[in-house]
Amino acid sequence: KGERTWLDFMAPVERFVYRICGIDPMQEMNWKQFLKALLTVNLFWFFWGMLLLVCQGWLPLNPDGNPGQSPDLAFNTCISFMVNCNLQHYSGESGLSYFTQLFVIMLFQFVTAACGMAAMAGVMKALAAKTTKTIGNFWVFLTKSVTRILMPLSLAVGILLIINGTPMSFDGRQTLTTLEGGEQVISQGPAAAIVPIKQLGTNGGGYFGTNSAHPLENPNAFTNILECWSILILPMAMVWAFGFYIRRRRLAAWIFGVMLFAYTAGVIFSVWQETGGSRQIEQMGISQKLGSMEGKEIRIGSAASAMWGMTTTVTSNGSVNSMHDSQTPLSGMMQMLNMQINC
């Protein structure tokens, strides 16, 4: 609404962006101009991503020598991350270089989240003003979504992840000797820069192939809570922002209440199912005292895995800390229901 906030210290950065991009922040747009700007920025970044993914074998920050993606795989990757789907037909350790992880995947995760927030800001302004003749400036909404929300939160979450063991380096793979005497190759890289926006932007595309089930992407119980919180915070906040902006906070409270009730009920049901274990597996003589642990990480456990499964599907995030197809049938049903409701 143009009111002063404590995040106004980012204004010089925003003015710099407007200046170098030739943007007039005072120019109002109608819905056609707004839509044209949204489609234009996404089209530009699509071709940017295609070029870098296909050519990544010749680009810097590739200590492991990962080759470029085939054109069809690059097309799939770009479309997937451009529409905030984050379907991955590759494994990040071998399918991408550090350069493309940062300047394609991480960039797209910021851009798509910011585009969604900018689009919602335009809708909210139109509803508040009861007109589509002027719905704000898309470029201003896009820029402020990044500088005032996504970047500060990502920085804070990233620092906490680094403290807890998530790597932030540009070194290549390390070969280690295990306790059994065998060798294991450990991939690393700038994971702590990418995981925060993966969660905060409800993106979901993992840095590593196994996503947040990987111990370097989600090292312990604290990071599991942090990443789960990161999934929820902005979708929840946007409901209240909607009510604030159109001056109907009671409506926002009702919407939030319905969403929270459905989410809480789903979490309770799924946790009950997963911690109860599988009767079929128990009949095979395998203890189910820890719950149904098939496809789950010991450091996370069945209850936290169940809660994550519900959290990631109610928000269309898609990240995982366990294998959802290994959860009990009724938990899987709840996750499918969440995805269908989101559609």
Give the positions of each predicted feature.
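Membrane-proximal intracellular helices of multi-pass ion channels
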Residues: 1-343
